């Protein structure tokens, strides 16, 4: 399956030898980094050293690689801090945001918003003033058809999608 997607790297240990109990610690860690980005402690600009990713995006990418390619347990904070150190993220600031509850509060807010908007999968697209939801493994043409229908339909007419 992965052979059809050259950007996907799947190692032999993914979901066999290493089975994290939860991905919540990774999300908590990423939320701390996102807060640092919002506060301009770290750059939010794309970086050519990371293939055009921001630091936040690069950390998320490397967490996925650590699990899927390298078979590491991304539920362990030590693994996450090692990855963050590799890209020179301010690990002390990340730890402080996790310790003081700010990252947890932001993560819980995201969970509440997910419930409010009835998010059932990833990715999820909420369209048409909240009346339409697309989620999961959808092809580009389905998403494009729905967006085009909304953009080009005459006023006061129901959408076909």
Report each predicted region and the residues it spans.
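Structural alpha/beta surface segment adjacent to cysteine/selenocysteine redox centers
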Residues: 1-67
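C-terminal cap of thioredoxin/glutaredoxin-like
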Residues: 47-52, 57-161
């Amino acid at each position: 399956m992965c052979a059809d997607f050259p950007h996907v790297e799947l190692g032999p240990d993914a979901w066999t030898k290493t089975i994290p109990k939860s991905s919540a610690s990774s999300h908590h860690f990423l939320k701390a980094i996102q807060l640092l980005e919002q506060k301009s402690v770290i750059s939010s600009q794309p970086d050519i050293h990371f293939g055009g990713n921001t630091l936040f995006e690069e950390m998320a990418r490397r967490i996925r690689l650590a699990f899927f390619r390298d078979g590491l347990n991304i539920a362990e904070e030590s693994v996450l801090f090692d990855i963050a150190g590799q890209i020179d993220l301010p690990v002390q600031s990340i730890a402080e945001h996790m310790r003081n509850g700010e990252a947890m509060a932001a993560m819980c807010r995201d969970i509440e918003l997910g419930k409010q908007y009835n998010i059932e999968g990833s990715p999820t697209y909420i369209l048409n003033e909240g009346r339409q939801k697309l989620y999961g493994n959808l092809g580009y043409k389905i998403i494009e058809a729905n967006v085009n229908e909304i953009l080009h339909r005459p006023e006061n007419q129901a959408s076909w999608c």
